[in-house]
Each structure stands twice: as C-alpha cells, then as structure tokens.
Amino acid sequence: IPRYKLQMVRTQRERGFRTYALSNINDVVFPFVRDVLFTQEGLQLDDYFEKAYLSYEMHELKPSPEIYRKMIEKSGMRPEATLFIDDNAENLHTAQELGFHVYMPRPREDFRFLFDDGPGR
C-alpha cells in the first residue's frame, strides 16, 4: 500500500471523518495485511480505520448486497453521505444501488484530489 494512501486515509480520520474498510479477505492473508502492510508508518490498522469489515468474519463477499447492509447496520453509516472507493466495478455497482457515492480509481492513480490532499486538486 503506497504510504501516501495510508496518510490520505489517516488525514480524513483526523479531520473527523469516519473511515471504514470493507474487504474480501481471508483469515490466512489478513494477518499479513494487518501486521505488515498497515504498519509501515509505525501505526496499526485501527489508526486508519474506525472498523475493518472483513468478508471472512461476516460470512459474505462483495458484491453481495448483504455484506454492505451488514456494514451499514453495524456502523450506523448513511450511504447517501458516504464515499465508497473500490477497484471493482461490480462492487461499486452494488454500493451505488444501495445509495453510496462511488469512485473507481484507475490502476496506480493518485486520487488524493478527491480529498484536496495532493496533486491535481
């Protein structure tokens, strides 16, 4: 995970935005992601996200609407006030059907401009 993306998420959280992850991940890969990829800055996953919703814990996979509904219910988020970012069009289609604002970054795209944090703002 590029450091600027980790910092982008952390900056939004510091600004008072609620940040969540919804991931189709399994229990074998998750420890590596949590303990290696998210600790580059000496921080933990919880420093970036209020909560990580993980498919293997929720027993659902994106793009099933049910995993989104469970996340909405558990978090209290309002889809109409939430930006959902994903690199899979099917996942975004479901999110949009449920009322989320959506964005699909291009491969290697620096999308900090969405948050006025970087190049292209």
Question: What does each model-identified segment do?
Answer:
Residues 26-27, 33-121:
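Asp-based, Mg2+/Mn2+-dependent phosphohydrolase catalytic module
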Residues 23:
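Conserved phosphate-coupling serine/threonine residues in phosphotransfer and NTP-handling enzymes
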